[in-house]
Amino acid sequence: MNIIQQLEQEQIAQLNKTIPDFEPGDTVVVNVKVKEGDRTRVQAYEGVCIARAGGGLNENFTVRKISYGEGVERVFPIYSPLIDSIKVVRRGKVRRAKLYYLRDRRGKAARIAERAERGSEKGKTTPAAAE
């Protein structure tokens, strides 16, 4: 690990933020701090993560949602002080790192299949438990 990566790791540890493990295709809710006049409130932004870019402190992710029939994309820096929290609503099964093709899709064609988590399948028994 070079000195720049070491400094970034120290700064990330200093921020003390818990970032959930999410990938492109996952539906996430990003709670963003919005300043209106002299007061601050938290606004939820829910959509599909279509890309993650960068690394370390400069990493960011793009969230796409459909608002009143219009596609809206927003890029969030992961370690931004304006982000209150990130929550993963559902995991998507995709085979690409960048889902920009969703921009051209509408309705059912833009749906992403849900990813089945390993070990959470009901009704399946392990061979050791069956004996």
UniProtKB/Swiss-Prot annotation:
This protein is located at the 30S-50S ribosomal subunit interface and may play a role in the structure and function of the aminoacyl-tRNA binding site. GO terms for molecular function: structural constituent of ribosome. Gene3D superfamilies: 2.30.30.790. The lineage of its organism: Bacteria, Pseudomonadati, Pseudomonadota, Alphaproteobacteria, Hyphomicrobiales. Pfam families: Ribosomal_L19 (PF01245). Residues 111-124 have a biased composition (Basic and acidic residues). This is Large ribosomal subunit protein bL19. Belongs to the bacterial ribosomal protein bL19 family. It comes from Methylobacterium nodulans (strain LMG 21967 / CNCM I-2342 / ORS 2060). It comes from the Bacteria. One of its GO terms (cellular component) is cytosolic large ribosomal subunit. GO terms for biological process: translation. Keywords: Ribonucleoprotein, Ribosomal protein. InterPro entries: Ribosomal_bL19, Ribosomal_bL19_CS, Ribosomal_bL19_sf, Translation_prot_SH3-like_sf. Residues 111-131 are annotated as: Disordered.
